[in-house]
Amino acid sequence: MAKHLFTSESVSEGHPDKIADQISDAVLDAILAQDPKARVACETYVKTGMVLVGGEVTTSAWVDIEELTRKTVREIGYVHSDMGFDADSCAVLNAIGKQSPDINQGVDRADPKEQGAGDQGLMFGYASNETDILMPAPITYAHALVKRQSEVRKDGTLPWLRPDAKSQVTFAYEDNKIVGIDAIVLSTQHSPDIAQADLIEGVMETIIKPVLPAQWLNKDTKYFINPTGRFVIGGPMGDCGLTGRKIIVDTYGGMARHGGGAFSGKDPSKVDRSAAYAARYVAKNIVAAGLADRCEIQVSYAIGVAEPTSISVETFGTGKVSEEVLIKLVRQHFDLRPYGLTEMLNLARPIYQATAAYGHFGRNEFPWEATDKADALRADAGL
């Protein structure tokens, strides 16, 4: 029997990089709500006492960047200088300019269907039947832990919690099947007046046990709860944060490859985002159709060109039909041109701020998680 361990991590909405992602996507959503055809590339930097919002935007919309930023930080929970960051007193600097006309001429077309890709690049999508949401288990449960931390912080169950937190889960596999959880790391920012023993008990009983399936925990499972012993200074005071620095947390926790392009702050004409969503949609439908147990899709683009420069499929030996057949089915059932995938997934609307914490995939409220093509794929594959 082949045994191996696999680890994925996640971070909470109060992590500095995630604050930046959420501000960038809040700006994107506010612009798309007024102007669905806007071109947006919004980057954010956060550090003690300040937020810098920059990037390139071409739009007819007007949004109050400062108020939007403060509202986002407030909703995350940084509302007092004791935390090292305060939504009402931090400085907000706006350095947004216009998109280069050189890019515009390569992307825009008289016929919208021939819209070119906003940049070159390669994107991956992945799905696996090891969970019911067709996502890898390690990242799924890493997200669930920090999501639970946020819930019990906000509802007052554990009032000493603060917004910044990180999780990490190591799963044990035999012959690529989960046999248990080997290790759990959960570090959470907290107020200075909570004793370490009380914190460990609260996290174990209120966050870890309700989230992780008991059948995967055993006497050998290792728990690391705030292993440094103290985590009072966190958020932007502890570390500066930048948009796009949590691309593995945002996707598959390292279980699949990544093309390198971040998502947050980018409108759907940016294939870094829209094609990665479409690739997840394709991979998930292939697995939902029973054509493979695991599936990774790669697509690539040239700037200003509508058709993908390549489409490839990898099923890791789990495919029920050949990968050549799968590629043919992908081309037949999915329009992966920039305009086509925006239309296919209805992406030109304000749905992005919710993606910017706890993962972009495995959450059924998003259109790229639908499995509406599975039956047709299965039928055309002859299964």
From Swiss-Prot:
- Region (Flexible loop): which ranges? 99-109
Q: Which residues cross the membrane?
A: none
Q: Does the keyword Chloroplast apply?
A: no
UniProt binding sites for K(+): 43
User: Has UniProt tagged this entry with the keyword Nucleotide-binding?
Assistant: yes
Q: How does it assemble?
A: Homotetramer; dimer of dimers.
Where in or outside the cell it occurs: the entry states: Cytoplasm
Cross-referenced HAMAP family: S_AdoMet_synth1 (MF_00086)
Its biological purpose is as follows: Catalyzes the formation of S-adenosylmethionine (AdoMet) from methionine and ATP. The overall synthetic reaction is composed of two sequential steps, AdoMet formation and the subsequent tripolyphosphate hydrolysis which occurs prior to release of AdoMet from the enzyme.
Q: Which gene encodes it?
A: metK
This chain belongs to the protein called S-adenosylmethionine synthase
Q: Required co-factor?
A: Mg(2+); K(+)
Q: Reaction catalysed?
A: L-methionine + ATP + H2O = S-adenosyl-L-methionine + phosphate + diphosphate
Q: Which GO terms describe its cellular component?
A: cytoplasm
What's the record's note on cofactor binding?
Answer: Binds 2 divalent ions per subunit.
Give the pathway.
Amino-acid biosynthesis; S-adenosyl-L-methionine biosynthesis; S-adenosyl-L-methionine from L-methionine: step 1/1
Which residues make up the binding site for Mg(2+)?
A: 17
A single GO molecular function term of this UniProt record? ATP binding
Family annotation (PANTHER family): S-ADENOSYLMETHIONINE SYNTHETASE (PTHR11964)
Query: Which EC numbers characterise this protein's activity in its record?
Result: 2.5.1.6
Residues binding ATP are 15, 164-166, 230-231, 239, 245-246, 262, 266
Q: Which UniProt keywords apply?
A: ATP-binding, Cytoplasm, Magnesium, Metal-binding, Nucleotide-binding, One-carbon metabolism, Potassium, Transferase
